Amino acid sequence: MRHCLALLVLLLSLPLSAAQLHLELGATTRQWSSAELLDHPQARDISIDQDVSYKRPMHYRAVPLAVLLEGVSASDHLQAVALDGFAAEMPAAPLLQHGPAQAWLAVEDPGRPWPALGQGKPSAGPFYLVWTAPQASGIRPEQWPFQISTIRKLASVEARFPALLPDPKLPADSAVRRGFALFQQNCLACHRLNGAGDAQLGPDLNVPHSPTEYFQPEYLRQLIRDPQSLRQWPQAKMPGFAESVLSEPELDELLAYLRHMAGRRP
């Protein structure tokens, strides 16, 4: 027994193994190890004033994401897939820009692991998309995916998942269409709708029913703002969306989209 305990302590004290980042950028595919990225000629030590995931200032060794996206243009669409099934849909343009907000791929050093995101939770590593000056370009929390395993170039959400589209007869400036854009930015990374989407974390938001059908309006708003105030369990992962992230008019538009899609179930 004593030998088993000693072995367990030894294993727990060993550094994390090097991770692999997979890039699938159309005709170009590439794998980067964490060691290669930490030694990348453009790697820098950066400071994040208010980290979205850790809720405090953080310091990282990071590479400008744009230098890794060989062959990607501003009109392309990318998806960052996390180890837990989170799938962030992102237009490429903000990821390629060098300011005012700039995207960085933070790389966890296996010899100096980052802190856990919470009790019983892993860290944000091995790879984490962070931003300097995010407020300058309106970068939202869902654009900070962590535990990234793969970044890939795909067709747009509209082209891949027509079941998500609102009625084409709606005017271009309708609240429902604006709500669809907000759904893509804030919800699609965790939820599918009408079975459409790549996320594997949260429930489908229209099949078999829309939350607009089984929640009273005030409770649905409360769920979106502060999920833990309505229901709690140890594995809960849904974040709350404060007004600084999703304004009241934007929440109205998001709910307008969900109500509209309740009538467009397959």
Regions from the PLM with identified roles:
Residues 192-225:
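Gly/Gly-Pro-rich "capping" loops immediately C-terminal to redox-active cysteine motifs
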Residues 200-206, 226-255, 261, 265-266:
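Axial heme c-ligation environment in periplasmic c-type cytochrome domains
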Residues 1-4:
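Positively charged n-region of N-terminal signal peptides that target proteins for export
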Residues 13-15:
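N-terminal signal peptide c-region/cleavage motif recognized by signal peptidases
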Residues 179-194, 220, 238, 254-258:
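The canonical Cys-X-X-Cys-His
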Residues 155-182:
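Electrostatic cytochrome c docking/interface patches
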Residues 49-56, 168-169, 208-210:
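Second-shell loop/turn segments in exported
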